[in-house]
């Protein structure tokens, strides 16, 4: 009668040793075998939670809490394969915080980090249904699968409006947050790779950055001061 529970426990232990942590040991025995089975199950549960925690840390940006560059690279590799096989379409949004180096030089990196966190929260709020990746000091990427241009345009308009509202109501510091953004689309049957779509979005972002900076330095219109 002890043979069957021991056999099940042995099989479960072998699965765990092979890397399968999705095991549930169902042993109703109240003897030493049952105690051992419960202990092994607890060990598996703890190990599963620990691995989940390690994975989360490995793919999370420490400063902002968004997905990091490692998560971004892994997702992009999978997306390139899926785009070819499944004929999906997607949009790539590239964002860059304006004047971050100047801000760090003038106010210090602690202030710069606070501004990055605030910018990250604005991006997450504007694209709350999508994963935000921080891939550089001041650079963020959002990938929108099954993207429709009209919906993406609305997301960007709302995002821009959100920055205006934040800067108007922000009492923590006088420095205004400015985030340049660009977008590009990948369509099914397109021969482009993710890298080429990213380059297009990155170029659009730099054009937006130039426009924002020119608006900053432009003289006031007649009747304005």
Where in this protein do the model-derived segments appear?
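The cytosolic transmitter module of two-component sensor histidine kinases
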Residues: 2, 29-36, 112, 152, ...
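Conserved long alpha-helical elements within nucleotide-processing catalytic cores of c-di-GMP signaling
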Residues: 55, 68-91, 98-125, 133-137, ...
């Amino acid at each position: 009668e002890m043979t069957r529970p021991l056999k099940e426990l042995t099989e479960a232990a072998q699965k765990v040793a092979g890397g399968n942590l999705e095991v549930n040991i169902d042993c109703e025995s109240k003897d030493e075998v049952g105690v051992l089975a419960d202990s092994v199950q607890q060990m598996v549960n703890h190990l599963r939670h620990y691995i989940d925690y390690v994975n989360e840390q490995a793919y999370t940006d420490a400063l902002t809490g968004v997905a990091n560059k490692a998560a971004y690279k892994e997702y992009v590799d999978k997306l390139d394969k899926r785009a070819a096989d499944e004929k999906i379409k997607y949009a790539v949004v590239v964002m860059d915080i304006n004047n971050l180096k100047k801000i760090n030089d003038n106010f210090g990196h602690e202030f710069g980090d606070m501004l990055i966190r605030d910018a990250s929260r604005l991006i997450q709020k504007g694209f709350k249904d999508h994963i935000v990746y921080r891939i550089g000091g001041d650079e963020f990427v959002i990938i929108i699968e099954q993207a429709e241009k009209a919906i993406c345009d609305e997301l960007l308009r709302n995002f821009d409006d959100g920055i205006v509202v934040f800067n108007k109501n922000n009492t923590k510091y006088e420095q205004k947050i400015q985030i340049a953004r660009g977008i590009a689309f990948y369509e099914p049957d397109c021969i482009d790779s993710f890298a080429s779509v990213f380059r297009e979005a990155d170029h659009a972002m730099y054009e937006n950055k130039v426009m924002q900076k020119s608006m900053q330095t432009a003289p006031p219109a007649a009747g304005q001061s």
